[in-house]
Every structure is written in structure tokens, then in C-alpha cells.
């Protein structure tokens, strides 16, 4: 499913790096591309996101919800104005059928005649067997209970972008909290940049575009960080 900042192309590489075993907690699950693959390696996976319509969609999918094959621009505008009429459908349309996968930022059109609703539906149906037993919760990331010994994965909004309800993401507070929970857990953070006390353990250059129908591609380097105090703990875990 189209989702701004989703890790669809990188999930197969990132998921194995997270390791396996007991419980994985994802603080910003988004489109769940990484999490869907990580379920193969962990006994339990908890997926959190503070976007209620996104979580409503995933919970409904677990219970048999089937997204539509086609969403017209009129239907798109209606759901944008009446979000609570069908939260699961709103969650699907708000991302899968929006320009750039950005929450209701304009009805997506493909100059080549592509069907964004059908494409999003197919990708979700393909991943749902892996997400069938995932626990989905909707909360601020600070409020997510972290089980003892769990692995934490954080893929926060890009610096400067807005969250649900147009609240700007506080990057400084995010890194402060990552330091705090790194005292008791191995925490992996997907980001482009990090403070000096966080170590990059993996990186890959990717090509992005603001609009696939225009010639505005640019390069970015996706990275995976852990706190410097977690390096020895991670090495010990990998040696076990």
C-alpha cells in the first residue's frame, strides 16, 4: 500500500537485521512492510501507530475487511469529509488512493492508467497472512508498554513532516526517548540522520520522487541506527 515513508523496497533487508526470538515492538508501524516480514522471526509482534484510521484498517483486515477494487474521486472526497462513517475504509482510501501515499493530500492519478485502489488492496491482501496474529494498538509512542527483553523498532516521521492532526513531529524529544529506552532494550531506528551518540549499522542509497509522473527524482540514504551503548549488547545477542 502506498504510504509516505514506507519501507516496501527495504523491508527484506531491514527485517532480518532486527533479529528474532521473543517480542518485537514497532512504535511507528505505518504500512507494516518491515513488520510483516519480521513476524517470521519473532514469537510476538506489537504494532503501534498514533493514526487511528490506519490502525482501524489493519484491525478490520484481520477480521475480514476487503478493500474496494476501485475508488472514484467523488468517493475519495466523500470519505475525506466523513472520515468516521467507516474508519477502516477511510484508513485505506486516505493512504492508498492519495498522492504520494500522503494522508488525504489529493486524489492520486496515474498518467499510465494505473489503479491505486486495486494496487493497494493487492499489497495488503498479500501481507495480511503475516499480520494475522499481530497486536495492533493506537497510541503515542511514549505510552507503548515495552515488555521485558523485547526488541524495539522505530521508523519515525521524517524530520519536519507533520503527524496525524497536523502536529509537527518533535525530533529532539524523539531522540531523548530513544536514549531512555535504549538503557533497557535494543532499539533500532530507521532514519536519514541521527545524533552523534547513535551509530549507523546499515545504510543504503535509494531513489525517491515527489511525483512519479514528473522528472523530479533525487537520492537519499536510508540508515539504521542503534545507540552506542547498545553495540555490545547487540553483538552478544548475535553471538547467541
Model-assigned labels for residue ranges:
Residues 166-240:
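Long, positively charged, glycine-interspersed low-complexity recognition regions
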Residues 22, 45, 151:
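Hydrophobic "anchor" residues on beta-strands that sit immediately upstream
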Residues 135-171:
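Active-site segment flanking the S-adenosylmethionine/decSAM binding pocket
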Residues 29-33, 121-122, 190-195:
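Short, polar loop motifs at secondary-structure junctions
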Residues 41-138, 142-143:
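Class I S-adenosyl-L-methionine-dependent methyltransferase module
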Residues 37-40, 144-148, 193-202:
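Short loop/helix-cap segments at secondary-structure boundaries that form the rim of catalytic
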Residues 27-29, 48-49, 137-139, 154-157, ...:
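Short His-Asn-centered micro-motif
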Residues 1-36, 40:
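S-adenosyl-L-methionine
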